[in-house]
Amino acid sequence: MLLLSCKTMYKTLPFSETPIPEAPDYNNNDSWAVLPGQYPEELISITGKSSQSDVDVFFVYPTLLTDKKDSSWNADFNRVDIRKNVLTKSVKFQASSWAKAGNIYVPFYRQSHYKTYVKPYDLEGPASWKIAYQDISKAFAYYLEHYNKGNGIIIAGHSQGSIMAKELIKDFFDDKELQNQLVAAYLPGVRVKKNELGSIQPMYQPEAIGGFVSWNTYKKKKYPKAYEQWYKGGVTTNPITWDKTTKTSRSEHLGTLNSDGKIYDMAIGIEIVDGLIWSTVPRIPKRFLLSFVKSYHFADVNLFWKDIEVNAQLRAKTWLELHKTN
């Protein structure tokens, strides 16, 4: 049986009739997109070579499995195209913003197809999401046992990656001993309510540690169709000032990482409304094309790439001063 919607037309079978891809073995380096000491060229091309740090960054990439003709519910991380997308899209343009703050770890995982967030396919979503989180949870547990060695931890993600990261925070940090090692959690691209993560609370100072930041970016004066359901009421951090400032001009913006690999400063001004960041059209090459785009979800990280890079280093420095002084 094929499940086809008039609007979305995703070719798919019921979850129960679809083969589940092989699980990653995190003892095998091939199950990691990024490990310290063996950064891929895609990452090095943006950040340069890394130096060892007493802070680690555990990054979970967003939904990259989106093809409407792909009938799978979960990604096969061994597929060449999937591995390439992770490196050339998310690692290069997203994970790179945290590279100067710590040692980067990015596990491959059997992420859920985008359709699991679209009606009527979302009815099968929970079964698919469970597989995705099983992988991320196992990857993080493996990281803790074999790599962490008492280092500070930055948890970062985007979109589906932030959904996975939220669950990590609940399971491994909230009221747990590991909470003392949490530098910060960066959770853009998904709604996070103030008390959703228990003792891990929102941060409203640029040097604060031990909490989380989150935001969702949209074109100025525009609202998503599902605003009430997916955005309203979420914590909305100002990712330029990192405080409770609700309007920030272009002059304070440190930089957007564009698809050409260049950073453009003073590119956007923002305004915070309930659950959203409203952004001006970025002043970057080919900006005319962006003037027709309402949702900047795809650029939640890229738009504030340099701002994140600088802030993550500040929070890492603060944590190190408190925990690693001799």
Regions found by a protein language model. Name each.
Residues 6-91:
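Flexible, membrane-associating and regulatory peripheral segments of lipid-active enzymes
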Residues 53-55, 100-104, 149-152, 179-183:
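Loop/turn elements at helix/coil->beta-strand transitions in domains of secreted/extracellular proteins
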Residues 56-60, 105-108, 154-155, 184-187, ...:
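Structural recognition of the beta-strand scaffold that forms the well-ordered cores
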Residues 62-150, 285-302, 313-325:
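Active-site catalytic motif of lipid deacylating hydrolases and related acyltransferases
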Residues 137-149, 171-318, 322-326:
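Surface cap/lid and interfacial helix-loop subdomains adjacent to catalytic sites
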Residues 157-161, 165:
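Gly/Ala-rich beta-loop-alpha elbow adjacent to hydrolase catalytic centers
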Residues 166-170:
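Short, hydrophobic alpha-helix immediately C-terminal to the catalytic nucleophile
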